[in-house]
Amino acid sequence: MGNTCVGPSISKNGFFQSVSTVLWKARQDGDDALPGANGAPDGGGQGRLPAPPPPTSDAPLAVQNKPPEHVKIVSTTDTASAEQDASKSSAGSDSGEAARPRPRVPPVKRVSSAGLLVGSVLKRKTESLKDKYSLGRKLGQGQFGTTYLCVERATGKEFACKSILKRKLVTDDDVEDVRREIQIMYHLAGHPNVISIRGAYEDAVAVHLVMELCAGGELFDRIVQKGHYTERKAAELARVIVGVVEVCHSMGVMHRDLKPENFLFADQTEEAALKTIDFGLSIFFRPGQVFTDVVGSPYYVAPEVLKKKYGQEADVWSAGVIIYILLCGVPPFWAENEQGIFEEVLHGRLDFQSEPWPSISEGAKDLVRRMLVRDPKKRLTAHEVLRHPWVQVGGLAPDKPLDSAVLSRMKQFSAMNKLKKMALRVIAENLSEDEIAGLKEMFKMIDTDNSGQITFEELKVGLKKVGANLQESEIYALMQAADVDNSGTIDYGEFIAATLHMNKIEREDHLFAAFQYFDKDGSGYITADELQLACEEFGLGDVQLEEMIREVDEDNDGRIDYNEFVAMMQKPTMGLPAKKSGGLQNSFSIGFREALRMS
């Protein structure tokens, strides 16, 4: 199962300025009373939760790392409940984005047997996974499952195993999505640039997909690592990417989530094949069939998808965006938040004037223009793209190096600044009871099953209670922004971090306490080793530590001091030049507070 049309890595810290003053004003008018812990309106009918008293300077920083009045739900597993994130996994799944938005007709139909009966998802009895494979270390984590290294007992050969917890498959659609993903992987099996599936297994706890192990790293990482990059190489990669799209379309499959994170190299060798992974959002289609559900990832989503009327042409648009990035290092349509990105996708102009475009061949620019035509009827098909002179073997793509700035931009674009989100989580977990009393009540109000985890459905209902009229894709984006560990749910600590008022984040004692959390040895600096340890504690594996440090390290000494740390917390989204001014107001927590109609 894949990502929804939600937060890109570099825009997660700036979100939804559009749901702001209007929502708060409506709350002031008292139209929607916010329920308290027992479901009744709080605050004497004013519709507000009790405001936390102002913090005192000597307030203890008691760690709040458990949900309030946590009631453990009986579960058949302690296995992690998130699907593989492509940027961290060697077999690949999506980048840590939330479950895909698709319209639901209330009430939601529950699949009561999915987490209890063997064969309830695959509809057949399978061999035991553990009889054939031994599971090793975790490779990656996403919304619905976790990917592990697994070794075939009979041969000792290594594979990747994506385990999807059945208790996460809440609706009939969720179950059908898993079945379809498996069917599509088998349907496309044998293509050299599509990840191969070894087998599917099911037990009472999870569905397990054993697939080819892709240990060669992500597309952009390999390019940056090599350091030498030419337009001809970009054309070669474009040929592979569009070739996969053509094969999918010829076999009646639309991928619907093409992005660089979903392309991994099979191994570390120079001649390693580039593989397409993660078919969680893919779907079978017939010629002329029209789809309406909004899925994908913001930078790569086609305009007709946002308009909820699209076909297979949307994949060509996504491939065109990837080629644009391969040539210049940044996406063609971007903004500081998801809403802005969607506006740019719908109405923005392609930039061929900024560097390095003046030095890029006219053939490359012609191809990109024709792939990024907003009218899908006028857009090139995948087959037509492969016939374009710039893409063809021995074609027009020159063998001259691209500007070195392309590599640095690409590296910035592909690396998430996870440090800031981890720091916000640390601050949230070190607030006193008084400081978060109101937020605790709000968490209890939304977490209706007292599981200690807010699901998408619970968040949707909670937002409706407070009068926030958001689209499903917007709610998924809020989930994405708050879900630091990519588990597909928002736990107590993540919720507090996402709803903190800026005056708490700016307090010196909170910033210093967060800095000390990362500065394990008390040296006054956060080193790469300390950052690696923190990432492991947060369940974030295979992150680009050097790039995370480089984004913050102003004096280029390879480590982060306290002043640099504070500056990071006060800056808007990193990675691309800011299109809008702003400081802490651009934090991802603002979008959550506004949606919940908080001050």
UniProtKB/Swiss-Prot annotation:
Its EC number is 2.7.11.1. Its main location: membrane. Residues 74-84 have a biased composition (Polar residues). Ca(2+) 3 binds at D519, D521, S523, Y525, E530. Residues 27-110 are annotated as: Disordered. Residues 133-391 form the Protein kinase domain. Residues 434-469, 470-505, 506-541, 544-575 form the EF-hand domain. Residues 87-98 have a biased composition (Low complexity). It comes from Oryza sativa subsp. japonica (Rice). ATP binds at L139, G140, Q141, G142, Q143, F144, G145, T146, T147, K162. Pfam families: EF-hand_7 (PF13499), Pkinase (PF00069). Expressed in roots. One of its GO terms (cellular component) is nucleus. This is Calcium-dependent protein kinase 10. It catalyses: L-seryl-[protein] + ATP = O-phospho-L-seryl-[protein] + ADP + H(+); L-threonyl-[protein] + ATP = O-phospho-L-threonyl-[protein] + ADP + H(+). May play a role in signal transduction pathways that involve calcium as a second messenger. Residues 397-427 are annotated as: Autoinhibitory domain. Ca(2+) 2 binds at D483, D485, S487, T489, E494. The lineage of its organism: Eukaryota, Viridiplantae, Streptophyta, Embryophyta, Tracheophyta. One of its GO terms (biological process) is intracellular signal transduction. Belongs to the protein kinase superfamily. Ser/Thr protein kinase family. CDPK subfamily. A lipid is attached at G2 (N-myristoyl glycine). Activated by calcium. Autophosphorylation may play an important role in the regulation of the kinase activity. Induction: By UV-C.
